[in-house]
């Protein structure tokens, strides 16, 4: 209940919310030796939904939240369908989004055509903690509890459960995925990461609150900025830009007000930052490279290496001036461990080029002087800032050369940068035959990023037989994102080829003309189709 109060306070401050509900017992679990039966997760989700929707943001919309659950939770079958249009108001909580947490054991059960066993977290001591912090221990405990006849459980086909996950993700566009093992092994923290944020780019430690003024609890905050890589002339220009971004965000940490004590103490002790990109599509087009080209991976590798290197260098320099953050000792950086040491090595199968910068000298500096910040990088959705900067949206391919964005203030037309000279080099989203190139680009970025990347899956049904995206294609993308180290998967976008005309057919001169809505909508039947929605939270607006 203290967490619910803090959610309300931050929603009132226009924040988007990440909630970890994975510890909540399953329905009908025994309380006080069976004296009381637990109500399960849905009543608590309805409470959270009411809290985030009761405060209007900018006088326009209610708040938003993403709730996280492990895939093996007793109620996962009911959780997966909470957003769809079937069912009743009693068993649906449509105005929240959901992130389903997976790990290696879950994927192994799928690949071996095995079973997945569901438990109430309270009935299986140690399993929830091990799920995030120790994969070998998790597997040992999971198999032990599967064999224990005294523990209440339910066993399902792994393919059946994964298919339900993919089906709901495809139909709603808003069932997200978090690979909790990658989020922790490729993390800058020694502390465990249990959840992400609203938009799935933040991976910071959290701790439940026992009361609203609890100093032992921990609320993680997103301190964000983005660099427009589309206008870079030279990679070494990153040095000044990264230094400026880091110094500006560092000042914000001390300047801003904190409505909850647990957020202030944690944020000031860890000083975690999340700097990302806008304009990646422009950057690739300037280099005459498409998203699916092998050369794109080399370009992104060099770009992101420079980006993370100079972010770390800026934080070291600030540590020399002001001192390392108080909780630096609780990071892997304190032991000289860098992102280049912990990334998923399968990335080398798709891009294996030599590092361009002197990482060993930087490692020595980090160990000697510390860092001012526990994290430096995160790739957020960036629709608003991309519009203001006249840049392409974050790392996304544009949906069209020209987009018309509608809001209460009227339509805004935006054309991709350098349209006349670069139009033949831009990759348009709905022209891509598959997600392979995009998945690989995000994987290469994740090699260097110390937090996560809001990566999307996008499908044009007209590229497939009978205008239907096969389940096998989506499962392949799920497995590839895991194989190449994605920490999270955000939206699933599907082109609405049956559009009533709000989206025109492809044209030779201006490509896809999207009807992009900025005004908030009630998206109970949202399918993430051809409409590119304005990011609807202030937490990821930069």
Describe each PLM feature range.
Residues 6-7, 24-26, 74-76, 84, ...:
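Short, glycine-/Ser/Thr-/acidic-enriched flexible segments
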Residues 31, 55-67, 86-92, 117, ...:
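Inter-helical turn/loop segments and adjacent helix faces that build the functional surface
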Residues 36-46, 53-163, 167, 251, ...:
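Conserved catalytic alpha/beta cores of large enzymes that bind or transform nucleotide phosphates
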Residues 1-33, 41-44, 54-58, 168-267, ...:
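Function-dense linear segments that define catalytic or interfacial modules
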Residues 526-542:
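Short acidic, low-complexity intrinsically disordered linear motifs used
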Residues 21-27, 67-75, 101-103, 122-129, ...:
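A glycine-rich phosphate-binding loop feature that marks nucleotide/adenosyl-phosphate handling sites
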Residues 199-207, 249, 253-254, 351-356, ...:
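Catalytic alpha/beta core of large soluble enzyme barrels
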Residues 242-264, 290-382, 454:
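Internal maturation/activation junctions in enzymes
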């Amino acid at each position: 209940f203290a967490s619910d109060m803090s959610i309300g306070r931050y929603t009132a401050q226009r924040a988007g919310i990440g909630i970890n509900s994975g510890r909540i017992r399953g329905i009908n679990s025994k309380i006080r030796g069976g004296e009381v039966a637990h109500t399960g997760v849905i009543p608590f989700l309805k409470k959270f939904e009411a809290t985030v929707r009761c405060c209007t943001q900018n006088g326009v919309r209610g708040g938003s939240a993403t709730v996280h659950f492990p895939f093996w939770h007793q109620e996962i079958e009911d959780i997966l369908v909470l957003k769809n249009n079937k069912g009743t108001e009693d068993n649906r909580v449509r105005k929240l989004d959901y992130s389903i947490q997976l790990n290696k054991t879950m994927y192994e059960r799928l690949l071996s055509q095995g079973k997945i066993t569901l438990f109430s977290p309270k009935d299986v001591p140690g399993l929830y903690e091990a799920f995030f912090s120790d994969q070998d221990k998790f597997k040992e405990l999971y198999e032990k509890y599967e064999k224990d006849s005294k523990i209440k459980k339910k066993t399902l086909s792994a393919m059946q459960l994964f298919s339900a996950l993919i089906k709901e993700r495809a139909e709603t566009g808003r069932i997200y995925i978090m690979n909790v093992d990658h989020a922790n092994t490729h993390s800058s923290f020694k502390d465990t990461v249990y959840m992400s944020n609203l938009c799935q780019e933040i991976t910071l430690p959290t701790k439940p609150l026992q009361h609203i003024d609890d100093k032992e609890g921990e609320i993680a905050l997103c301190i964000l900025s983005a660099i427009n890589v589309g206008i870079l002339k030279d990679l070494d220009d990153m040095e000044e830009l990264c230094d400026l971004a880091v110094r500006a965000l560092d000042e914000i940490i001390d300047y801003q007000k904190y409505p909850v004590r647990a957020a202030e103490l944690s944020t000031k002790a860890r000083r975690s930052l999340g700097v990302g990109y806008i304009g990646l599509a422009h950057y690739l087009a300037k280099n005459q490279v498409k998203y699916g080209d092998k050369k794109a991976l080399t370009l992104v590798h060099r770009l992101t290496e420079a980006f993370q290197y100079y972010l770390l260098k800026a934080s070291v320099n600030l540590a020399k001036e002001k001192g390392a953050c108080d909780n630096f000792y609780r990071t892997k950086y304190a032991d000289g461990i860098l992102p280049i040491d912990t990334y998923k090595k399968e990335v080398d199968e798709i891009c294996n080029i030599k590092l361009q910068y002197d990482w060993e000298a930087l490692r020595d500096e980090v160990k000697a002087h510390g860092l001012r910040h526990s994290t430096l990088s995160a790739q957020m959705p960036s629709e608003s800032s991309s519009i203001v900067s006249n840049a392409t949206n974050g790392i996304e391919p544009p949906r069209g050369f020209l987009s018309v964005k509608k809001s209460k203030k009227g339509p805004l037309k935006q054309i991709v940068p350098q349209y006349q000279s670069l139009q033949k080099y831009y990759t348009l989203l709905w022209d891509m035959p598959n997600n392979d190139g995009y998945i690989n680009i995000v994987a290469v970025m994740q090699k260097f990023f110390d937090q996560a990347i809001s990566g999307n899956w996008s499908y044009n049904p007209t590229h497939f037989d009978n205008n239907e995206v096969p389940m096998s294609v989506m499962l392949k993308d799920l497995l590839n994102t895991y194989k190449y180290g994605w920490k999270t998967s955000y939206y699933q976008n599907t082109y609405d080829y049956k559009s009533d005309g709000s989206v025109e057919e492809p044209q030779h001169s201006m490509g896809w003309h999207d009807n992009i809505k900025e005004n908030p909508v009630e998206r109970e039947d949202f399918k993430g189709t051809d409409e590119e929605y304005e990011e609807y939270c202030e937490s990821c607006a930069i």
